[in-house]
Amino acid sequence: MQFIDQANIILKAGKGGNGIVSFRREKFVPAGGPSGGNGGRGGSVILIADNNLQTLLDFKFKREIIAKDGCKGGPNKRSGASGEDTILKVPCGTEIRDIKTGIILGDLTKHKESLTIAIGGRGGHGNAYYLSNQNRAPESFTEGKDGEIWEVQLELKLLAEVGIIGLPNAGKSTLISVLSSARPKIANYPFTTLIPNLGVVRKIDGNGCLFADIPGLISGAADGVGLGHDFLRHIQRTKILLHLIDSIAENPLHDFEIIEQELQKYGKGLLDKERIIVLNKMELVDDDYLKIITKKLEDLSKRKVLVISSSLKKGLSSLLSEVWKRI
């Protein structure tokens, strides 16, 4: 399934039904009173969060959503039927923003949480509404009101508790595949991962914790370079970031600094998040070098650095223990 995490759509609520002019036509009642009914309310457009959805793909080609109009009133003071509401299901974690003003209209983070965006127009009044002592046979009526029109941007921000970040080829996909049942594409070249991968990791108590493998960031990602800018939003909701560093990289210290700089430039509190620094691929370097680079990373980051091998599944218990302590 294609991963789409942003969509611009137009939401049009239904028009209210018109009121009508009608008079009672009954046997032996030659001059019946006004009986024109009111029009029905126009349908509204309502967004509902659904845990079963992971993408905004449904809105890639469906850019205009229109709710049903209300029906006109009927004789004998019958009100017209209301227009059916249009229900749009979106993934949990979808933020809705008004394109014209930039104002956030809502943020649907819980299953079945709903938000009414475009409200249907009110139905018009039939002539029975205008009956008065001064006017016993009114012929006035009103048309239904137009429904609201909103142009909004839907933006999906994944609800993972733990985000795995790092430069391309740091081993993020391998790590999430051994920690969970996720099966991302894994290969020994940069940008294998083109979309965020999600995996549920079980805690000791049996409860699940959602991890997200974020596609490789590169220098300039916060400014739109490479793939990273498109996916940095997905770590905004995480509680912890696992910063994975390739121990066989030409300069692991420089790699660490690149990601830190991108988090700082992107802003939105990313640099303030709890971070665990993880040196991966320990099996590919000798012990002396590993000790040296670990010490330098700890001095640079002012944090404890964990050393692991995703492919050999070494050091993962210590890593998860550290994660559980911080959630």
Swiss-Prot record:
Keywords linked to the UniProt accession: ATP-binding, Cytoplasm, GTP-binding, Hydrolase, Magnesium, Metal-binding, Nucleotide-binding
One GO MF term attached to the UniProt entry: GTP binding
Residues spanning the signal sequence: none
Domain of life, per lineage: Bacteria
Binding site for Mg(2+): 173, 193
Cofactor(s) the protein requires to work: Mg(2+)
EC number: 3.6.5.-
Enzyme's top EC category: hydrolase
Matching InterPro entries: G_OBG, GTP-bd, GTP-bd_Obg/CgtA, GTP1_OBG_dom, GTP1_OBG_dom_sf, OBG_GTPase, P-loop_NTPase
OBG-type G domain location: 160-327
GO CC aspect terms: cytoplasm
Domain Obg, first and last residues per copy: 1-159
Location within or outside the cell: Cytoplasm
Biological process terms in GO annotation: ribosome biogenesis
Pfam families: GTP1_OBG, MMR_HSR1
Residues involved in ATP binding: 166-173, 191-195, 213-216, 280-283, 309-311
Role played: An essential GTPase which binds GTP, GDP and possibly (p)ppGpp with moderate affinity, with high nucleotide exchange rates and a fairly low GTP hydrolysis rate. Plays a role in control of the cell cycle, stress response, ribosome biogenesis and in those bacteria that undergo differentiation, in morphogenesis control.
Record note on quaternary structure: Monomer.
NCBIfam families (UniProt xref): Obg_CgtA, PRK12297.1, PRK12299.1
Sequence similarity: Belongs to the TRAFAC class OBG-HflX-like GTPase superfamily. OBG GTPase family.
HAMAP family in the cross-refs: GTPase_Obg (MF_01454)
Protein's recorded name: GTPase Obg
Species in which this protein is naturally found: Prochlorococcus marinus (strain MIT 9215)
Protein encoded by which gene: obg
